[in-house]
């Protein structure tokens, strides 16, 4: 059995001590979540101070970002974490998406499914598996020039997990 936990960080600088402590007491994974601080930044520090702990977001708000932004973040984090990164995405709730992030809210399960599909298409392009040609109902990613293509990740693309409530989002998570 593997044991993972989230690390509540009042100050993102605390990642340099909290995550090594989790590793030293036997946890297999340590995750951040989107609350007072961006969930990705503390993981950079955690990666510098750990060697085996799986690191990831549980969760980053997907609807506050676009698939290309998320793919670039995940690719960079996978490199910095030495192949230990997990991209965990969640939708948040409608009032926060619309009023806090000023982003559209529509068909959350379909949107989450398409975000994950688009991220995977972007990863495939970077891994040399063909041109970028993702054409969904909500997102389109159809151009990737060498200046923006990080190329194959030396650790492979990170896993993408989703979280959510209700049967539709559970179905998305099952197929993510």
Language-model regions, residue ranges each:
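N-terminal beta1-alpha1-beta2 module of alpha/beta enzyme domains
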Residues: 1-57, 63, 158
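Residue-level signal for the nucleotide or nucleotide-sugar donor/cofactor binding architecture
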Residues: 10, 64-68, 72, 107
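Intrinsically disordered, low-complexity acidic/polar segments
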Residues: 14, 66, 169-171
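Conserved N-terminal glycine/acidic-rich loop preference
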Residues: 19, 33, 63-69, 83, ...
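Glycine-rich loops and low-complexity Gly/Arg-rich segments
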Residues: 28-33, 55-58, 80-83, 111-115
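Short acidic-hydrophobic sequence patches enriched in Asp/Glu that either
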Residues: 38, 69, 111
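A general structural signal for well-ordered alpha-helical segments in protein cores
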Residues: 40-43, 70, 116
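Internal, glycine-rich beta/alpha segment that forms the wall or movable "lid"
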Residues: 72-75, 79-176
